[in-house]
Structure formats: C-alpha cells, structure tokens
Amino acid sequence: MSAFGFPGGGAPTPPQGSFWDMTPEQQGMYSANLIMGTMQSCPGKSVMAGVTGFGLGGVFGLFMASMAYDAPVGMGVQTMSDLPFKQQMKIQFTDMGKRAWSSAKNFGFIGGVFSGTECCIESLRAKNDIWNGVAAGCLTGGGLAVKAGPQAALVGCAGFAAFSAAIDVYMRSDNKAPPSTDEDL
C-alpha cells in the first residue's frame, strides 16, 4: 500500500488506447479497479464512513427525538397539551428535524475523522492490528474534546480508545462465526 492508502499512486491507466477503444469486458474491469482503488484509499474510506455515519446519525437522532415525548428543547410552554394539535405537530416535527440534523452531523464527522485517522495510521505503520484503532480512537476522542481543556481531551482520548479496542477485540474474535454444521455445537 502506498502513502496514505492511495493505490499505486493514482488511478489505474487503461491498458491500451482510450477507454472507448476497450472491449466491454476491459471497460468493466477498468471501472471495477478504479472503484475498488477509490474505496480502499484513505480519502475514500473517510468519505464512506462520514456519509454512512451521517445517515445513521440522522436515523438515530430522528428516533431519539420521537421518543422524547415531553416538551421539545427550548419551548417556553409549560405543557404541550395546552397547544392546539396542529401547533403541537409543527413544534414536534421541527424539533425532530433539528435533532436529526445535529445527530447526523456529529456521527458523520466522528465517523469520517476516526476512519481517516485509522487508515493513515495503518498506512504509516504498515500493519493491520488492534493498535491502529486504539491510536485513532485516542486521537479522535482527544481532538474532539481539546477545546474543553486538557482533562477533557484526556478523558476523550481514553474513552474513544477503550471503545475502539473493545469493538476491535470483538470483531477480530473467532466467537462471532456461526458453526458450519449442527455437529459442531
């Protein structure tokens, strides 16, 4: 793997002539190699994690906002039941949209930063082990909390590193594989 995950220093070159001079099979292989190279690069992984995190965060935020059946944040009314139904719906949907957007931005940012950091560390170390995720978790957690002070950065570093280590240990364990036959039980 080359520096920071760019495969072969850039996009693959067509085997002969232009793209349109290739056979359909060659075009398919060229396109597949281009897509795979992009998805395996650090920028590609970071963008994919950010977009996926954004989508997952939006769904999570929408779900959490729908579960908050009390008064929305910042509402000056004592109870929602005092308002007409149409006004209640308007306030609830506005609040759900704000929470979903906020959660989506946070999840997307954290996913993109963590994934990009982990990929860069893996490329620099030229190893694929648990310590890449631990270091990336520490850098991501500490970096996100650095504005709150050194203690918050240290707690963020430790928290993200521990969570990343726990997920990596679980994902690398052999316990998750189902038995191949009933006799293996």
UniProtKB/Swiss-Prot annotation:
The keyword Hydrolase does not apply. GO terms for biological process: protein insertion into mitochondrial inner membrane. Disulfide bonds join C42-C119, C138-C157. It is a multi-pass membrane protein. The chain crosses the membrane at residues 47-67, 130-150, 151-171. Belongs to the Tim17/Tim22/Tim23 family. Component of the TIM22 complex, whose core is composed of TIM22 and TIM54, associated with the 70 kDa heterohexamer composed of TIM9 and TIM10 (or TIM8 and TIM13). PANTHER family: MITOCHONDRIAL IMPORT INNER MEMBRANE TRANSLOCASE SUBUNIT TIM22. This is Mitochondrial import inner membrane translocase subunit TIM22. It comes from Yarrowia lipolytica (strain CLIB 122 / E 150). The lineage of its organism: Eukaryota, Fungi, Dikarya, Ascomycota, Saccharomycotina.
